[in-house]
Structure formats: structure tokens, C-alpha cells
Amino acid sequence: MAQAKEVRGPGPRMGGPRPKVENPGKLLKRIMDEVFRHYLPHCILVLVCIVVSALANVQASLFLKTLMDDYIVPMTQQQDPDFAPLAAALLRVGIIYVIGILAAWGNARIMVNVTQGTLRNLRTQLFTHMESLPIKYFDQHPHGDIMSVYTNDVDTLRQMLSQSIPQLVSSAITIVSVFFSMCMLSWQLTIVTMLMVALMMFCSKKITQQSGKYFIQQQRDLGKLNGYIEEMMEGQKVVKVFTHEQKALAGFRQLNDQLKDSANKANSFANIMMPVNAQLGNISYAVCALAGAAMAVSGMGGTTLGTVVAFLSLNKGFNMPISQVSMQANSIIMALAGAERIFKMMDEESETDEGYVTLVNAKYDRNDQLVETDERTGLWAWKHPHHDGTTTYHKLEGSITFTDVDFGYVPEKTVLHDINLYGLPGQKIAFVGSTGAGKTTITNLINRFYDIQDGKIRYDGINIHKIKKADLRRSLGIVLQDTHLFTGTVMENIRYGRLDATDEECIAAARLANADGFIKRLPEGYNTMLTGDGANLSQGQRQLLAIARAAVADPPVLILDEATSSIDTRTEALVQRGMDGLMYGRTSFVIAHRLSTVRNADCIVVLEQGRIIERGSHDELIAKKGKYYQLYTGNLAEN
């Protein structure tokens, strides 16, 4: 099949220049909007808890001045001190601390609920949006990179929401309340403290600037590594067949080393921040202690021993939030890098659908008029609303026509040229040609995985752009080139073709596809669990289940994309008999490597480099001795 994506060999993908987070403020606002949309009352309660906890800590520090000046110092001057007032004072301090602890505990418990709920909502939105994305998005993005958004990037938000943002808010409230408290105790010592804080902030800014860019690169490198691992897991058989284990390992090591380097640089800068700030905080504490002691001894500004003790406690409480702000800044930067990837995926344009013609169950009334019904009658009709408010119903026949169709996966490169063909109800149309001729591309246009650039495709005379995509695809039974089975029972995988199908209908579909025989030989029959994309089945058995899945949908049009290319000759004969019964009365578009499977086609279309070069029945094309004759006889050297 012609593809619009870049074809690359199995190996590491080298990145370009180091990425930067665009509009971090806008990203943070978008995250918080998501939180507030569902958890605003919880966030208000968290804020109350943070304020109570911060004020409790400040009040406890201020109480030290009263404790020293009014209780402890006077008691040292008494021969027979009374400890009862001191005990009462200590009890009050203890109550203050308990209130602070309870508030901090409440804050943590509520934030766990808010964080996990927000992440659940984000994952749901991501998956919902992913389901609406066009096929070309998945053709152009490595699946491992998409998985990394769900896992690594979402997890970075968990740390930011549960720890970083609450600590930043707590630190901000603590800094403000402690600052005013320090000013009340001693403006001179406050100036000394602020000078040291300015130095801490300067150092933190420099460190954050260096670590931030490496945290962003770390997230990108992690996504690349995940994508490579998934690619190698899916292609493990190919790797082993061509004995490329060492090449695969070399590619992994390169990406793994790339991740190690960016993670080392990011965490090296981040890890030195705490020790640097801690040492600067200790210096600030020591300088304030010396200055405070000198002021207390000289009596400057009415400074007492209690003032110095309380101020030193506040000094510690002031430096710690400053250090936390610096450390959490790195976590937030890393989370914003993940958020950028999350919202980039969520902002991808959904698959557009301007269709208004729908597919409905129908029946004939007493006047022999086609009318809509809720019952499954086996008769389908196109429901066509008109501008004048009227609605007409047209029986679904299964006629598909291509008229002057041009298409390219990218606008500047056309891969299908001037395609004209038709499939009448009940006809079997076969596409043959060399690899890359455009056979599968045509089937992708029928189900509108991609839209044409020029020309028209009509379904029962209706332009398929007027038909809603879901209804269009519901009328098509498709057996894809790569058979995909889901984790679940055999019965559930067959029922995937029509979710309301009964067990009896699923079994009948399996019999029609000649899959019933091997299914009954499975350990649990139709209740046998399939895992790992049906890894416990042979390729032929998986193909048979895919055909049964299409059969249970009972569609008027079938698309069989190389459905029997991976099945042995004996199994192919079984499938072919089942498919002949399934295709009877249905318009069928078939692609097959084995031309013997399409000899009975009503029309064989020969494609070469995106153009139709021959068409006709098997006998007609053999008589022409053209391209089809060469393909059928293997005489490709002729002409």
C-alpha cells in the first residue's frame, strides 16, 4: 500500500535541537482549569487547611518569645519556681502544633483525591479524543510515543498536583506570614535575613535554568525509548529471522544512553539545589543568631532573649519554604513538559465528518413504502434529510462507483491517478498489481480512512462525503491485512463485528467462515481466552476469526484486504468456500496475493503505480496477455 509517512529502518531516531516548553503560564492555567472544573470546593478546603497549618506554625514560633520572656527567664531568677504556669503554656503550644498537624493531614488526604480524580479525567479525555483521531495520526506517530503520554507524562502531573503546587501555595503563605512576623519582632534582623534570601533565590534561579531544559529533554528521550522498545517487541520475529539482535541492542543502548545523559544532567542540577539552599540557610541562621545575641546583650531596639529565640525559629521557617519553592520549580517544569505533550495530543484535530445521511433499519409498510423501524429486519436504508424538511429513504443496495478519483497521502504526491471503476450489487471486484500499486489505498478510500483530493466516490448514488462516517463503516465488512484480535474470549472477538449479536449468530458466522471446526478443538471452545493479539492461535486461525467477525456484521459490502495471504493452501480452500457463501449477494472488493483466489471475480482491476492499466474477467485478461497475464503466469520478464 502506498504510504504517506516517512519510511525508516529499525534504529534510534535522532532528535533535533533541545525543545523548550512553550507558554508555561498558559499550560499551568489549563491544568488548573481542569482541576477547578471538577474539584473547586475541594481546592478551597485545601487552601483553608494550608492557611491554618501555616498560621499554626507561625503562631507557635511567636509564642516562643512569650515562653522565654514571661515564663522561662523569670523562673531562672526564682529560688522556688512554680512550674504550673509553664505547663499550661506548653499545653497551649502543643494544641497549636496539633491543629497544624491535623490541617496538614487534611490537606494531604484531600489532595490525593483531587490528584487521582484529575488524572482519571485527563486519561479519559485523552482516550476519548484518541478514539476520534483520524487513522493518519496513528500512521504518523509511533505507538510507543503515544503510550508514553498516557504513562510517563500523566505521572509527572501526579507529582505536580499532589506535592509541588500545594507546597508552593503553602510556602507562599508561610513566607508572607513569617515575613510580617519577623518585621514585628526585629526589622534589623529581617534585613539580614532578606539579604541571605536574595542570595538563595539568585543561586536557585541559575540552577533551575540549567536543570529545566534537561528535564524537558528527559521526557522526550523517555518517549523515544518507549517507542523503540514497543517497535522491537512487535518486530521481534523479524529481528530474530534476520539475526539483527545486536543491531537492535545497539539502537536500544544509544537511546538508553541518550536518556541517561539528559536525566543525569537534569537531576545533577536538581540534586545540588537542596544542599546549596540548606547551607545558605544555615549561614543565615548563624548570622542572625550572632547579630541577635549582640543586640540582646546591648539592649538595642528592646531586643530580648525571647525575641532572638522566636526570630531564629521564624528564620528557619522562612528559609525552608524558599528552598521548597526552588526544588518544586524543577518538578513543575518537568510536569509542564509532560503537560505540553498531553495537550498537544488533545489538541490534535479530530476526524471531521460533514455527513448527514444515516443508515437505519427499514421495512416496507402496507403501501409498499420503505419506512424506518427500530427492529433489526435485515433490510437497511439510507435516511436522507432534505433542506425542505422532508426525508427520503433509499434501500441500501451496495453499489459503489469511483469517478475520476485522484488521491495522495500528502498533497504534493499523488498516489492514485484518475481512478474510474464501479462495483454493482452482488459483484466481486478484485484488485491485483505489484506491491505499492495502490490496491489497499483504494479500499482505504471506500471506508474514508482518508479523503480524496479530486473526483467522487458514490455509494448507491450518494456521494460518500454526505454519509456519516460511522454509518458508512457500519455498512462495510472489513478483513484487514493485519489481523488484530483483542484480549477476551473467542466468542467476544467474533461478536466485536456486531455487539448485539447472539451466541447463535456468532457461531453461525464462524461456521460460514469455516472457523467452527478449529474453535471447537480449542481447550474451552468459544470461551477460550485469547491474549497478546491472539498469540495462542496460528496466523491462519486468526484470519478465520477476522473473517467470522466480518460475517457476523452481515454487511452488504465486503472489503477483503489480502485476507488469505497468510493462510496455507488447505486452510485457504476452507476459507474460500466460506467466503464464496459470504460474498453471495454482496458487493465485494478483494485483494489477494494468490491470483487463483480471484479467478471467479466479476471484474479484475489491474493497478500499476496508482493507475488502472487493465480490467476485465480472468479469461479476458489472460487472452490479452498483458500485465495480469504476466502476474498470473509469473512471466514478468515479458515486455
List the predicted regions and their residue ranges.
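Membrane-integrated ABC transporters
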Residues: 1-57, 72-93, 107-111, 115, ...
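Short intracellular "coupling" helices and adjacent cytoplasmic loop segments at the cytosolic face
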Residues: 12-19, 116, 124-148, 152-154, ...
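Juxtamembrane helix-loop junctions of ABC transporter transmembrane domains
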Residues: 17-25, 48-49, 56-72, 96-143, ...
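An intracellular "coupling" helix at the cytosolic face of ABC transporter transmembrane type-1 domains
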Residues: 37-40, 135-136, 154-161, 165, ...
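Transmembrane helices of ABC transporter permease
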Residues: 38, 42-55, 96, 102, ...
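Hydrophobic alpha-helical transmembrane bundles that constitute the permease/transmembrane domains
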Residues: 51-59, 94-105, 157-160, 164-176, ...
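Helix-loop-helix
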Residues: 74, 181-195, 265, 269-340, ...
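ABC-type nucleotide-binding domain
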Residues: 79, 362-639
